[in-house]
Structures are given as structure tokens and as C-alpha cells.
């Protein structure tokens, strides 16, 4: 009985050891299989976002400059709501999933602006009708709206400076667009029609330049993926890296 018990214990120990070894081998195999499994990557939405921004900004800017007498911005409400409104908000969420906080903030900000600006200009929302007896108050209200958004875009511009010159130029000229357009509405509110018109056209000119920067970025991103070359963006990160090192020392 004693030998039998010892044999049983020894057999159990051997089985346990074998089970432990098999379990360890299984874990090792699973770990190796996981290591060799390709990670699933999410595609970049940046080109789509830049394209939507470029389309909305260049068309609106041409209207502000009154090219071919296209002075009525209501014609671009579709752009405001769908192309640059919903489109940029969706792109922003995509950037957030990829971990790009800057892209999420910029695309999301411009998307929300376009949705709000579209609502102001869309007759269905009744904004203009609410101020039909006091157009100066409407111009002042829109001026404040644009001025506050210009401040927001100014922070975008500062954040883009350590990245590259193209992003800085695009956001900087768009910030000037908001500021000049706000000044234009304030001038119209004060019955300075000629000054208001000049400021509006100047805002359109800066907005058009901002749109060109966006188109350039679209070309850079698309050629980078399809043709294996890209356009220079004017990388400023080395300059800011040197400035940070000097500041530390």
C-alpha cells in the first residue's frame, strides 16, 4: 500500500509537471503568434479634411471677393453644412481615434464653425428675419461671432508653428480672414459701406490664399501615397527643437 501510494503521488507529480510544461509551451506559442500577427492600421483622413476645407474656403472666398458678381454667400450653404460642416466633424473624430489631438481640434473647430455659419445664413433658421427691423444689430452680432472664432484660430496658428510653414500659413491667413470679415461686418453696422466692402474683399483674398495652402497640402498627401514623393512643407520642428535645447541650457 505504501509503495502504491508513493507511485500514485509520483505519477500525479509527473502529470502536473507535464501539464505545467504544456501550459507554458501553449502560452509561449500564443505569445509568439500574437507577436507575428500584423497590427491593423487605420488610414489617415487628413487629405479628406484638407480637401473639404479647401473647397469650402476657396468658394466662399471667391464669393467674398465678388468674382463674376457672385456676392451672395447663401449659395454655399450646402458647403457649410455638408462639405465643411459634417465632413470636417467626421474627419475630426477619425483623427481622434488615430491619436492626433491637433488634427481633431482643428478639423473639429472648422467643422463646427461651418455648421454655425451655415445656420446663420440659412433662411430656415430665421436668423436674418429676427433682425429684419435692426440690420445693424445683425451685422454687429455676426461681427462678434467671427471675431471670437478668429481668436480660436489664432491658437491653432500658434500650435502649428513648431510643425511646418504650410500649416502655419494656412491657419495664419485664415485667422486674418476671420478678423477682416469681422471688421467688415462692424463697418456695415456703422453705415461705412465702402470700408465694409473693401474689408470683405480683403478677407476673401486672405481666405483664398488659405485655401491654396490647403490645396497644396492635399497634393502633398495624395502624391505621398500614390506617387511615392511629396511636396516640401517647410518643416520647422528642427528649429523649435534647437530653441528648446538652448532654453534648457
UniProtKB/Swiss-Prot annotation:
Q: Where in the cell is it found?
A: Endoplasmic reticulum membrane
* Description of what induces expression: Expression is correlated with the production of patulin. Expression is positively regulated by the secondary metabolism regulator laeA. Expression is strongly decreased with increased sucrose concentrations. This decrease is lost in the presence of malic acid. Expression is increased with pH changes from 2.5 to 3.5 in the presence of a limiting concentration of sucrose, 50 mM. Natural phenols present in apple fruits such as chlorogenic acid or the flavonoid epicatechin modulate patulin biosynthesis.
- Give biotech applications: Patulin was originally used as an antibiotic and specifically trialed to be used against the common cold, but it is no longer used for that purpose since it has been shown to induce immunological, neurological and gastrointestinal effects. Genotoxic effects of patulin with dose-dependent increase in DNA strand breaks in brain, liver and kidneys have been detected in mice. However, more recently, it has been proposed that patulin might also have anti-tumor properties.
Q: What happens when the gene is disrupted?
A: Strongly reduces the production of patulin.
Pathway(s) per entry:
Mycotoxin biosynthesis; patulin biosynthesis
Q: Does the keyword Coiled coil apply?
A: no
Alphabetized InterPro entries for the sequence: AceTr, Gpr1/Fun34/SatP-like
So where does this one cross the membrane?
A: 42-62, 71-91, 106-126, 141-161, 169-189, 202-222
Q: Which residues form the signal peptide?
A: none
One example GO MF annotation: acetate transmembrane transporter activity
Q: How does it sit in the membrane?
A: Multi-pass membrane protein
A GO cellular component annotation in the UniProt record? plasma membrane
Q: Which UniProt keywords apply?
A: Endoplasmic reticulum, Membrane, Transmembrane, Transmembrane helix
Q: Which GO terms describe its biological process?
A: patulin biosynthetic process
Q: Does the keyword Transmembrane helix apply?
A: yes
Q: What is this protein's function per UniProt? A: Acetate transporter protein; part of the gene cluster that mediates the biosynthesis of patulin, an acetate-derived tetraketide mycotoxin produced by several fungal species that shows antimicrobial properties against several bacteria. May be involved in the uptake of acetate, a substrate for the synthesis of 6-methylsalicylic acid by the polyketide synthase patK.
Q: Which family does it belong to?
A: Belongs to the acetate uptake transporter (AceTr) (TC 2.A.96) family.
Q: What is this protein called?
A: Acetate transporter protein patA
Please give the organism: Penicillium expansum (Blue mold rot fungus)
Provide the organism lineage as a comma list.
Eukaryota, Fungi, Dikarya, Ascomycota, Pezizomycotina
Q: Which gene encodes it?
A: patA
Amino acid at each position: 500500500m505504501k509503495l502504491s501510494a508513493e507511485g500514485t503521488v509520483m505519477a500525479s507529480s509527473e502529470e502536473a509537471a507535464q501539464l505545467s510544461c504544456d501550459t507554458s509551451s501553449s502560452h509561449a506559442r500564443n505569445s509568439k503568434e500574437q507577436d507575428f500577427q500584423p497590427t491593423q492600421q487605420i488610414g489617415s483622413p487628413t487629405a479628406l479634411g484638407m480637401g473639404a476645407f479647401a473647397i469650402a474656403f476657396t468658394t466662399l472666398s471667391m464669393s467674398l471677393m465678388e468674382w463674376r458678381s457672385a456676392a451672395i454667400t447663401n449659395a454655399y450653404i450646402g458647403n457649410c453644412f455638408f462639405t465643411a460642416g459634417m465632413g470636417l466633424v467626421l474627419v475630426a473624430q477619425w483623427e481622434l481615434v488615430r491619436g492626433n489631438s491637433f488634427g481633431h481640434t482643428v478639423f473639429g473647430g472648422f467643422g463646427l464653425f461651418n455648421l454655425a455659419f451655415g445656420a446663420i445664413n440659412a433662411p430656415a433658421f430665421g436668423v436674418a428675419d429676427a433682425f429684419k427691423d435692426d440690420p445693424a444689430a445683425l451685422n454687429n452680432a455676426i461681427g462678434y461671432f467671427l471675431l471670437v472664432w478668429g481668436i480660436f484660430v489664432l491658437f491653432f496658428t500658434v500650435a502649428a508653428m513648431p510643425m511646418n510653414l504650410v500649416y502655419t500659413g494656412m491657419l495664419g491667413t485664415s485667422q486674418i480672414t476671420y478678423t477682416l470679415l469681422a471688421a467688415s461686418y462692424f463697418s456695415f453696422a456703422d453705415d461705412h459701406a465702402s470700408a465694409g466692402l473693401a474689408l470683405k474683399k480683403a478677407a476673401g483674398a486672405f481666405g483664398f490664399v488659405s485655401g491654396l495652402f490647403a490645396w497644396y497640402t492635399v497634393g502633398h498627401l495624395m502624391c505621398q501615397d500614390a506617387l511615392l514623393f511629396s511636396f516640401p512643407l517647410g518643416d520647422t520642428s528642427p528649429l523649435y527643437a534647437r530653441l528648446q535645447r538652448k532654453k534648457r541650457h
